[in-house]
């Protein structure tokens, strides 16, 4: 079961308790709760673990009772980045709970894939094969199963992967390094080939991401343009991941396609919200803040919430703050 907001069975820690209270309080502004979450994520992701690691994981999991789908999906993402088996039971509980928001359950499934533990395979396979589950859940579980199998395979040990600028644990690794110069058209073809398994298409996606960073790389703009074509894919899950990758890249060439996705009232919420947050990472670019403000009263709650967080992130980008976090003391920063 998820720990309560006040549960502190592993002993008091002033930093974690302060952050936990902010994160789990429905009276706190959403942007402040997100900053608290990213501070807790930093503590939860410490390698090797510290005395604050488990309490930080418990603090993150305590907020799964929130009514905010946006916050809960971010909790699941953060737990998936911890590389810690203590996160697994909380995520398994969420992914099995059909009363939870679909976006949150999807993120929990993806997080289980990121953690890579084989004891999650059974529940992921059951959900993948259940035709009564929403497509986004089945597709996410399909990718997560493939990722766990890859993580624990001899194939992984044999593959040579390009060093990435990104420290995130992704839903799929990039494609193995080619013996020749990487061809963006070839990778794009793989990205857009709907006959391929989603896991393989995701590998192409993250290969293109790595060819787009840093932004002054000769391949960067072409890689972003190739990724942008994925925003027209029939899979909402795939489209949302493209938007997430654009948020990581913060490349100005992605602004037109992200703006189009956010502005499309016929697009699903999980894609539009991801587009909003990605635009938030580009908040110092001309016109982005004005675009985001147009959606502060959007009919969809998750889009409205994302715009609030995105504008807070944009402010952080403009102000040149060191970390997007809530810092109770000098020992905490956001990962």
From Swiss-Prot:
It is an enzyme of class 1 (oxidoreductase). It holds the Pfam family HEAT_2. It comes from the Eukaryota. It catalyses: [eIF5A protein]-deoxyhypusine + AH2 + O2 = [eIF5A protein]-hypusine + A + H2O. Binds 2 Fe(2+) ions per subunit. Fe cation 2 binds at residues 240-241, 273-274. Its main location: cytoplasm. Belongs to the deoxyhypusine hydroxylase family. SUPFAM superfamilies: ARM repeat. GO terms for molecular function: deoxyhypusine monooxygenase activity; metal ion binding. It is found in: Cytoplasm; Nucleus. Its cofactor is Fe(2+). HEAT-like PBS-type repeats lie at residues 71-97, 104-130, 200-233, 238-264, 271-298. Fe cation 1 binds at residues 73-74, 106-107. This is Deoxyhypusine hydroxylase. Keywords: Cytoplasm, Hypusine biosynthesis, Iron, Metal-binding, Monooxygenase, Nucleus, Oxidoreductase, Repeat. Gene3D superfamilies: Leucine-rich Repeat Variant (1.25.10.10). InterPro entries: ARM-like, ARM-type_fold, Deoxyhypusine_hydroxylase, HEAT_type_2, PBS_lyase_HEAT. Catalyzes the hydroxylation of the N(6)-(4-aminobutyl)-L-lysine intermediate to form hypusine, an essential post-translational modification only found in mature eIF-5A factor. One of its GO terms (cellular component) is cytoplasm. Pathway: Protein modification; eIF5A hypusination. Its EC number is 1.14.99.29.
């Amino acid at each position: 079961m998820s720990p309560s907001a006040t549960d502190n069975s592993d002993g008091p820690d002033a930093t974690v308790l302060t952050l936990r209270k902010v994160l789990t309080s429905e009276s706190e502004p959403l942007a402040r709760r997100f900053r608290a979450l990213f501070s807790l994520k930093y503590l939860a992701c410490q390698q090797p673990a510290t005395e604050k690691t488990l309490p930080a994981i418990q603090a993150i999991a305590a907020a799964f009772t929130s009514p905010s789908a946006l916050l809960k999906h971010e909790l699941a993402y953060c737990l998936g980045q911890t590389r810690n088996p203590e996160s697994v039971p909380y995520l398994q509980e969420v992914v099995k709970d059909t009363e939870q928001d679909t976006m949150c359950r999807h993120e929990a499934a993806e997080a289980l894939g990121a953690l890579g533990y084989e004891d999650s395979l059974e529940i992921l396979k059951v959900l993948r094969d259940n035709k009564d589950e929403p497509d986004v859940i089945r597709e996410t579980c399909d990718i997560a199963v493939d990722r766990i199998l890859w993580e624990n395979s001899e194939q992984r040990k044999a593959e040579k992967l390009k060093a990435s600028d990104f420290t995130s644990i992704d839903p799929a690794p990039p494609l193995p390094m080619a013996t020749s110069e990487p061809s963006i058209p070839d990778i794009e073809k793989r990205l857009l080939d709907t006959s391929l398994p989603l896991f393989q298409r995701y590998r192409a996606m993250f290969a293109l991401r790595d060819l787009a960073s840093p932004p002054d790389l000769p391949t960067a703009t072409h890689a972003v343009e190739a990724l942008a074509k994925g925003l027209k894919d029939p899979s909402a899950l795939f489209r949302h991941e493209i938007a997430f990758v654009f948020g990581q890249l913060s490349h100005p060439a992605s602004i037109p396609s992200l703006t189009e996705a956010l502005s499309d009232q016929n697009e699903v919420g999980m894609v539009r919200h991801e587009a909003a947050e990605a635009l938030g990472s580009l908040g110092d670019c001309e016109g982005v803040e004005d675009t985001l403000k147009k959606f502060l009263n959007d009919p969809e709650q998750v889009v409205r919430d994302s715009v609030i967080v995105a504008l807070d992130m944009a402010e952080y980008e403009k102000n040149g703050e060191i970390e997007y976090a809530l810092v109770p003391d000098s020992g905490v920063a956001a990962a």
